[in-house]
Amino acid sequence: MKKIKLENTNEVLYYDKLDNGLEVYMLPNNNVNKFYLTLNTRFGSINTKFKFDNKEYDMPKGIAHYLEHLSFNMEDGSVFDHYSKIGSSINAFTTYDITSYNVTSNNRFKENLEYLLEYVYTPYFTKELFQSEKGVIEEEVKMYKDDPGMTIVNGTLNNVFVNDERKYLVGGTVKDVKSIKLEDVITCYDAYYNPKNMFLIITGNFNPNEALAITSEQMNKLNINNDFNVKDIYPKEPE
């Protein structure tokens, strides 16, 4: 495990890369009560065109955001319900190039971290859950479209870029959402939710040696396939 001293703050950043490729960044601060867990994949709204398993794909816009929504389900119930019972707060967000899953708590560090890794790396995608979430996402997309700030940002990017996917809304349009299929979501998950394409960030009150041991042990239990063979296809901007 590498230690990197941050001169400006007099803190130490710990870094390690597990055998399966998952990168772990840890910044402990024992002056606070809470800890923050963030599991991230380098998959966002711009990653709609790619080559995976020797086949090219052109996915609907907003699919990364759709996948994020579906990730909060396990076979035994809702991820939100599980974390609520142990007093933890969770959230997630999708940007142009990253999807992030977050947990905040002040106790039961091991359980919080283990479950974060478990639910993200063992998806439960069913036709029923996929269909029920579609309406929720459509309403969210409509809400963003009515937001003045989002409208200004999107309008600006729409004028800045010609072909770049950043000119489009992260969640896509209602039409985009309607066009997304369950098999599309599964393909994107298999392609991008790979330890070699992901990184874990832990900050706050925790022990970095303990955190790394828990992460390594849990990833070994989950036995995730880390054969990463995605090649992104980005449209070129005119010079």
Q: Where are the regions a protein language model picked out?
A:
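His/Glu-rich zincin catalytic helix
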Residues: 1-79, 186-239
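Charge-rich, well-structured scaffold segments of protease-associated domains
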Residues: 17, 74, 78-230, 234
